[in-house]
Amino acid sequence: MFEAKVKKQIKSIQFGLFSPDEVRNGSVALIVHPEVMEGGVPKTGGLIDLRMGTTDRMYLCQSCGGDNFSCPGHFGHIELTKPMFHVGYISKIKKVLECVCFYCSKIKIPRKGIKSTLSNVWGMSKGRSVCEGEVLDNGRSGCGNKQPVIKREGLTLVAFMKGEESNEGKVMLNGERVYSIFKKISDEDSVYMGFDLKYSRPEWMILTVLLVPPPAVRPSIVMEGSLRGEDDLTHKLADIIKSNGYLKKYEQEGAPGHIVRDYEQLLQFHVATFIDNDIGGLPQALQKSGRPLKSLSARLKGKEGRIRGNLMGKRVDFSARTVITPDPNISLEEVGVPLEIAKIHTFPEKVTSFNIDRLEKLVRAGPNEHPGANYVLRSDGQKIDLNFNRSDIRLEEGYVVERHMQSGDVVLFNRQPSLHKMSMMAHYARVMGNKTFRLNLSVTSPYNADFDGDEMNLHMPQSYTSKAELEELALVSRQIISPQSNKPVMGIVQDTLTGLRLFTLRDTFLNEREVMSLLYAVNLEFCDIPLGDAVQTGLRKGKDYDIMKILRKPAIAKPMRLWTGKQVLSFVLPNLNYIGLSSEHDDDDKENIGDTRVIIQDGYIHSGVIDKKAAGATQGGLVHIIFNDFGPKRAAQFFDGVQRMINAFMTGIHTFSMGIGDTIADPKTVKVVESAIRKAKEEVSALIENARQNRLERLPGMTMKESFESHLNLVLNRARDVSGTSAQRSLSENNNMKTMVLAGSKGSFINISQVTACVGQQNVEGKRIPFGFSHRTLPHFVKDDYTGKSRGFVENSYLTGLDPEEFFFHAMGGREGLIDTAIKTAETGYIQRRLVKALEDAIVRQDESVRSGNGLVYQIKYGEDGFDATFLESQKVDVKNFTKRYYIDMFGTEELEIKHGQVSEEVYGMLSSDVDLQKLLDQEYEWLVGEIFEGPPILSVGEVDIERDYKVRDIYQSAVMSPCNFTRILATAKRTFHLSTGDVSPYYILEAHKHLTTSNRILNVLIRTNLSVKRVLLEHRLNTEAFNWVVEVIDAKILKAKITPNEMVGTLAAQSVGEPATQMTLNTFHLAGVASTVTMGVPRLKEIFNVTKNLKTPSMKIYLDREHGKSIEAAKTIQNEIECLTVKDLCLFSEIYYDPEITGTEISDDKDFVEAYFEFPDEDVDFSCLSPFLMRLVVDRAKLVGRGINLEYVAMFIRKELGGGAHVICSDENAVNMVVRVRTTKSEDESLNFYTTALNSLLRLQLGGYKNVKKVYISEDKDRKEWYLQTDGICLSQILGNPAVNSRLTISNDLVEIAETLGIEAARESILRELTIVIDGNGSYVNYRHMSLLADVMTMRGYLCGITRHGVNKVGAGALKRSSFEETVEILLDAALVSEKNICRGITENIMMGQLAPMGTGNIEIMLDMKKLDKAIPLSNPVFKPNEPATPVISTPSSDSFSISSGNWSPTHLEMAYSRDLGERLSPTSPSYSPTSPSYSPTSPSYSPTSPSYSPTSPSYSPTSPSYSPTSPSYSPTSPSYSPTSPSYSPTSPSYSPTSPSYSPTSPSYSPTSPSYSPTSPSYSPTSPSYSVSMSSFSNKNKSKNQDGDKKRRNDGSF
């Protein structure tokens, strides 16, 4: 049945133009009649001629005989009377015309040395006005004719000679004329212009035969009665046929030229609007109703068009949608599905011998009873509907039953908008009553869902492969940690979080009955789950969930037994170690009086209140640790356990509700609030008075008004804060509102202060409410009222209620927020789509490189380290007391040596006597210093004081991301292996460093600092066994964190950057005049992705060299050098006077210095030709002094700029007014306008600084303790040339300028920097690797490539991929013109073709060795016949395999022996091993010594056989060689080859389905270096130690 469905793969697509012959050959009918029907039947030669196929049930296709379902449709054609332009190609036709000679059709220029593409040839030819052709021996090959200029007018082209643009000289070029020119173009010329002789010739751009699409493409609708509604295309084709017929008729009749021309233009119009009905400058073709017709192009374009609407994404079957409702008792991994949906959604299950009985029951139940089945598919392909004949159906193997969805089925659940991959996750269905989907509360945050009426979609997988992929890749529990910011996306929320805080307070005590009910609430059915896939499995002391551990030890024994909440909660935790602080923590509280230090050891909560910091979706919180160390399953159970326990506590023991009483502050607080507001009002009045009296001081960089507003804001905000804090303080500890804020489940302290004390200032566009009309905000305020009340300060709280005007202002502020959100959604949605399209095919290959579908390399190693962000945790490099902690000096400084008694004798002996070892230790220390610090080179170790002389490298100052959490691994080791003194040989430690060395610098530093010899021996005091364990765990973690090949990291990066954008603000408000007025949020993100040339706020951050950076005065001199200074900047005001007395003046203020000047005037000035108009500039003395220049310099500068024609004099430096007078020579135009223009150009003269730098602010860098300059405006190349500037640290925010000045690598760094600034500024965090991939995609081509249709969509990708983004039709037309061949390697192409896209699991090929198949053992039935006990059994997914050599296989008791509990299975007292176990009873019939197959003489069961001897060491339950943590027990270890009799590959502890040994788990890869033989240096040296330890540990039943 399935074999017939194997499809051929489309490997590539060839685009091209149809030649007229191809159209005629491929057509089945010549269409000549515009009518559709004749006498009630489709008319032959009409537009729905039956030869083209049919859409009507009543007819069959006359070409293929198919009916309306099976016939795909066949094309017809129309013979056009005259050639017509193809509207999509008119601009290209014009280009070709400009390339070739109008008369002889040769290319106008010599062909040598030009690349053969149309645009290149056209660029060279379009200016040539003579046909030159090739250079030959006897001259030129061209005809030498003068060439016309060609212009496009509407749908026609016009030719005229240069200079004769009048109507007489114009010649209309119709299709016929151009066709004749194109037909004469030679083959080599066509190829030279980029055409292809086989697929696209120039004359084919002109239509002579029109292809008619079959009726299937344009089906008609039959209305009631006999009316038919035809499709838009049919109408259009009818118009074409009509006008074509008229044109033919008139031409044959010899009608006047203008009539023929009119009909030709009409036909051209119809042909054009058939193809595209949105041509600029042309009227649209309309239907009778006035609606524009939908053309062919419109069908392809846009979101609803063919490409994006029907090929890239389709509507699917087996999907359901309904409202979602919360359910506190459903598991995190489940979704409650309404029964109605479960009956409709089916899964096709194949009938086998194992499930035939179950499926027969379902078939009998039928479609209306759940669980039942809807259809049966027989082997011959027949589908039987079970609604009718289900009683007589006999199932056979190979049939397929479409059974109902049942509880436990995997389904895909989704909420739109799907912004990141956690918006689609797999859940297990749980079929329930009612009509809504039920959802666990913690899973709402990744979906961004709430329950105010949201709807969600559910999809049912339809094959075992998709089911397996959902379960292994998309399951909720596997998505708990997001690769976006390497932290959990789910945490405990809402009431559970509130309850969690109350539950773990110090005063929560529970009696025996309550404890029992809480423990009962935690569903214990999963207590035998595997303990996670970390190597740490080896460390369990007893099982998780040991109830007695808690019940045996109540916190209070007398007078009654009471347990604390912390004790009971510990029951839900695995054996983890965690130290953290809760949100109320006060650093001064050293004694932990507030119980804010959370300490959990071995899964037992010792102290601390658990709130959002520990149990929420926080980095390094409990959820994060459980997921990383114990696996996804265990994390999901933590959620379920906590929720069930706390919900039971909140419903029955300690209920919680909030009422109006929680918002009322006490009378004392009310007084405090009132006085704070009263004081603020007084301060505001004083401020207004000061401003009116001009006593207010102006703040730097602000106008007077801005300074006033800034002062006011400070006062009003202070009032709100003071009243808010006092209100909070007054609320008691058990106030319910405060409880929620402290737990982190809802609200913040601002909310509390607004509800109880004062709502505060309302803002619009970041300022106070603006005046609306005639200087008021609302009509009942007086004019120019600047007080708080009038400008939107709300002094009431929500509790007391707002006044009408306060309410109005509050609504204004709220309205702005709504508008902002609405606009932002559209903007960020588009940004997200562009990002995904640009990065969609970036995929990690087998070699860890990231490449595009075409094989272009984006990154040599993904994220520069090859790790998957999901498994990373943040780590700090510890540099405190560096030398003391890391350097061992046994032969020098006494304080740096290791003392006797601090380590074992053996190690001390080595350290104190071995000089070679000391050299190695010196090298290790020097390497560390070199990697972590930048500073003077190391002369000899110990001479330099690292703390003083060196600076830690920037990268290690903040937290770095690493796959191992060293602190936690070491803490676990210390608690597990009872340690006293370090006894690991230093050589062995250094050897381990070598073994763990990776290509990742940061990781190497982390490994060598945390496992440095001195710290291992003194600080951690590890023994060899513990050290080996630590090394193994680190090794396994590093392997596990490697990125999986074929992961779609591009899409992941796009989502990770796009999703935070939806949280960003659209408009960024800032206080005016503060230096940090740079664009942020969505507008800045758009600037980065679009690579905008003109930024809104271009700015540079300029660091200065040592001498200028240290003092503010020195920095000011540089500020003056850089800031642009014009004449206007220095002037207080400027004026134009008519002052005809040249040697004197009418202006009284200037009399003195003018007369003084004219007593001794300059000799060479001719005063008679000076103008009577005078430009007078009054200069600001303060500015002159501030810029350090004098008035004479300004006058001299103006003189120099204006040249000899002007006369400039200035007043004395000490005069009251500093004045510069400028007169020009008389001009012909002596109007005032002339002088106004002259004055303006004079004011624009630049006296100093850089032209683009409008303003420079001085700021202080607190970390570096130096001053730097922040500019408004940029000129990077000039600034870097300034000797006082530290060019290494100076940065600009203009990517284009950086790329031009410093090159592409610098641009890449600055894209990263700018992205980080925007995302951090919004309070989000995105892992570095996503932004680095984005930056690489934007810069990999060597130039900046924006994420727009002009950037990424222009280059490299195939036509199909580009057309799926934007400009669909244009791209496809161009592809046909240049006969592009699109090879289907990318994602888009394969999705369009309906093929499996090469991504993720679809990118895996199976390599099969056919020769090995000859030796294969045939599959046997897993039932033993008495005579074949030793047949090898092959395991299939549907049968368990028990090899006879598997020691714990009992034929009579499968369940016990195959229990999944690790602890039970290997415990000597486990029933399946106990000699008293019924299944091992010697009298059991299956063990009867007389049973033929167990005859004592049977060779395979001979009691003397060494491998089956009960006393044989290989079967001793305490045998050391079976410890799963023993390093020598490696699957690839030679001594345990699968052929060894004592190692059974089918032994249950190595079952391929065991989650902890999943073949897909990265940490158990057979090629894993940590399991390779090279690890023997760890396993052999301490085998004996390990075995002793294992013996000790195994007796308590831990394995």
UniProtKB/Swiss-Prot annotation:
Zn(2+) 2 binds at residues 101, 104, 131, 143. It catalyses: RNA(n) + a ribonucleoside 5'-triphosphate = RNA(n+1) + diphosphate. Pfam families: RNA_pol_Rpb1_1, RNA_pol_Rpb1_2, RNA_pol_Rpb1_3, RNA_pol_Rpb1_4, RNA_pol_Rpb1_5, RNA_pol_Rpb1_6, RNA_pol_Rpb1_7, RNA_pol_Rpb1_R. InterPro entries: DNA-dir_RpoC_beta_prime, RNA_pol_asu, RNA_pol_II_repeat_euk, RNA_pol_N, RNA_pol_Rpb1_1, RNA_pol_Rpb1_3, RNA_pol_Rpb1_3_sf, RNA_pol_Rpb1_4. The tandem 7 residues repeats in the C-terminal domain (CTD) can be highly phosphorylated. The phosphorylation activates Pol II. Phosphorylation occurs mainly at residues 'Ser-2' and 'Ser-5' of the heptapeptide repeat. The phosphorylation state is believed to result from the balanced action of site-specific CTD kinases and phosphatase, and a 'CTD code' that specifies the position of Pol II within the transcription cycle has been proposed. Keywords: DNA-binding, DNA-directed RNA polymerase, Magnesium, Metal-binding, Nucleotidyltransferase, Nucleus, Phosphoprotein, Repeat, Transcription, Transferase, Zinc. SMART domains: RPOLA_N. It is found in: Nucleus. It is an enzyme of class 2 (transferase). Mg(2+) 2 binds at residues 450, 452. GO terms for cellular component: mitochondrion; RNA polymerase II, core complex. It comes from the Eukaryota. Sequence repeats lie at residues 1473-1479, 1480-1486, 1487-1493, 1494-1500, 1501-1507, 1508-1514, 1515-1521, 1522-1528, 1529-1535, 1536-1542, 1543-1549, 1550-1556, 1557-1563, 1564-1570. Residues 804-816 are annotated as: Bridging helix. Component of the RNA polymerase II (Pol II) complex consisting of 12 subunits. This is DNA-directed RNA polymerase II subunit RPB1. It comes from Encephalitozoon cuniculi (strain GB-M1). The lineage of its organism: Eukaryota, Fungi, Fungi incertae sedis, Microsporidia, Unikaryonidae. The gene is RPB1.
